[in-house]
Amino acid sequence: ASYRAIHDIREEERYYPDARAIDPDDLPQFDLLCGGFPCQAFSNAGRRKGFADARGTLFFEIARLAEAKRPRYLLLENVPGLLSHDHGKTFAAILSALDDLGYHVEWTVLNSKHFGVPQSRKRVFLICYLDPRCAGKILPVFGTDGKALIQVLGGSQGHRVYDPEGVA
């Protein structure tokens, strides 16, 4: 309640049990759409069925919302197996869909251990933007000094933060 009052937010958070049921007309305008579509369809630990797995098609729900709402930026995340799935055809289809929507895409693989997180977890990140003037200003991203988030923030800031030296 306090956060809503401070930031003049009049709407409650909304939770959708199924991304396919989201009506874009029910959403306010926004500048950034973040999505981590299910990775099981592309992961080495999964069966790697790709778009043949219903979970693998949820990227297209993100694309549907992006087409309807036209946010300036998209930030997408998945496992590195997405890059090589079906000999790169799956990733090419995703890039093509984003291009068809008018988004310029930069992507990279980052490992959480380079950003002060006490685990090694590689993920591919796609940063997509409508304005071509953003090109070259976003990536590459590097972990600067290996400090943990708790060391940078100087405390947990009201949330559980994991420190490489233990739970804070």
Question: What residue spans do the PLM features occupy?
Answer:
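SAM cofactor-binding core of SAM-dependent methyltransferases
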Residues: 1-20
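Solvent-exposed polar/charged
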Residues: 5, 35, 67-68
